[in-house]
Structures are given as C-alpha cells and as structure tokens.
Amino acid sequence: MYDGYVALIDQDRIRILADGFTFTNEIRLDAKEEFLYVVETTGKRISRLRVRPDGKLTDREIFGPDNLGKGFPDGVTFDAFGNLWGTLIMSDQLFALTPEGECRILFDDGVPAATDALEKAFYARAVTPELMLAAAGKVAPWMASVTFGDPDLKTVYLGRLRGERIPYFRSPDAGLPMVHW
C-alpha cells in the first residue's frame, strides 16, 4: 500500500511535494539541506529526494538497502559525520547508514524468535497484538526514536513505546545540530 506522502505547509495551504511512499514516518534533512530522507516504515526502507531551491523534491531513490531487514524503520537522526542513525521497531535494533548507504547495526536488543514470528506474520498479513507484544527487547522495548543530546551532542537517547525510562549512552561521535538551533 502506497499511501504515504510528504507535504509542505505554506501560509494558508498544504502542498503535497511527494507521494507514493509506504507508511511515511519520520523525515530528516541532511546537513547541507540538499536531500530529504523519508522513513518508509512498512516499506522497510529509507528513501531520499533532492531538495531544489524552489522547494520541489526530485530524484527520488532508495538510500541504503532496499530492505533494512527484520523490524520496521521508525525514528532517524544524523550524526556530525553524515551517518543516518535509525531505529528498527519490533526488532529493537539501532542502525546507522553511512553516507555511502552501508547499513551497520550498532545495538541489538531484539528477541530473535519473536521477531522472526512477527516478520512471517507481516508478510502473510496476519500480525496480531500478541505477536507484536512478544517482539520487545529488555533495554529499549519497541525502540522507536533516536536523538543526540547534552551540550556536546554525544549522548544518544533511545525513545521507546514500552517501558518507563529512556535508555541512553555516550557516543564517540556527536549528533548533527538541528537546523532551527
């Protein structure tokens, strides 16, 4: 199902800039604001579009693997070196895509048997709440977002949809400051 889109709000109207995505989720601009990265959660991939000076999006392509593997990409953020960090919810993995598009798993908190069962059900269109609930790690169950914080932007915070705390760790690399800072 391709029902996702990217829209821009201009003063009094909304314009759809790109559509045909599979469950559009989070979006991020790179440091130079040359490319917009779009998380396609149930498409299991990240798409990238060139941002033209007039705001139009062109040259759509898949960035990184065309299938990120088990789980579903959710939250993303950039580090200062141009690596796109992201989460795979339901497999509870933290990954990074290098500027060249190579995928590296940085942290794996998943439950392999539960994730395998959920993957099989996803492709059979037979996902149940019980399968989803079983696919939850211990440190960051249903890991859904990632961001860099603290003054040096070297503390990584992992957002999760289950649990009562926010896991974090120190990174040797800083995050990319947000454009609006």
Regions found by a protein language model. Name each.
Residues 4-7, 45-47, 93-95, 165-167:
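A short loop-to-beta-strand structural motif that recurs across blades of beta-propeller domains
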Residues 2-11, 171-174:
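Beta-propeller blade signature
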Residues 1-3, 43, 57, 91, ...:
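A detector of repeated loop/turn-to-beta-strand junctions in beta-rich toroidal repeat architectures
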Residues 1-6, 15-35, 65-86, 91, ...:
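Beta-rich, blade/repeat-based domains predominating
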Residues 41, 51, 89, 99, ...:
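Short loop/turn segments immediately following the C-termini of beta-strands
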Residues 3, 13-16, 59-62, 102-104:
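Predominantly a core beta-strand signature of beta-propeller blades
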